[in-house]
Amino acid sequence: MEIYIFLYSSRFNTSGRFYFAGVHNIIPLHGKGIASSNDFDLNKYDLIVARKRNYYVTNIKNHYCRAHSEGDLNILRSIVEAMYPDYNQAFDTVMHGRKISLYNMFVGKADVVNQYCQWLFPLLDEVNKQIDFSGYDSYQKRILGFMAERLFNVWIEHNKRNIKVGYRKVVNIEGENLIKKGSALLVRHFLK
C-alpha cells in the first residue's frame, strides 16, 4: 500500500506528463507538470519527498528563528532530547545545515510512513502542550506545521541508512513569487 501526503497548494512535478489525476477525470492545469500516482516508483524508493531547498545565506535553525520564535524551537529541541535522545545528532545536523525538504509532502510505503507518524505525532502533541499560542497571529499559529517540516528532515537524517529516499521537484499550483520570497528571506536575515 502507498500513502500520499500533500500540502494544499503544492504537488510533485513530473517531466512529460501535464495533468492532475482527479478522482474521476483528468484536470489540465495550464501546462504545469503535476505528478500522478503512476509517476512514483516505490519499488526503487521507500519514500519520495520534495527536492531540498538550499538556503545560501543562512542555516535551517537561523532561518526558522528569524521567521518564528526561537524559544519555541528550543522547546522542540528539548522535547526531542527527552523523548527520542537518539535523534539529537540528526536534529543538530539538520538545524545547522543549509538544505531542507519543505512542504510536509511525501509519497511512501505504508510501513515507512507509519514509522514516521508514530515518531512525529507524539512529539507534536507534546510541543502543542508546552507552547503558548495566545499571542500568535494566524500565520504563527501554524508553527506545528513549520516544525513538522523540520522534524521530517530530522527523521530522514536519522533513518537514512535504513530507507531509500527519492527527491522530486515541486510545483505550486497557485504560483509562487520567488522574488518576493527571496526578498523577504534577505530582509529577515539581514535586517531583523
What are the residue ranges of the model-derived segments?
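ER/Golgi luminal nucleotide-sugar-dependent glycosyltransferases, focusing on the catalytic module
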Residues: 1-192
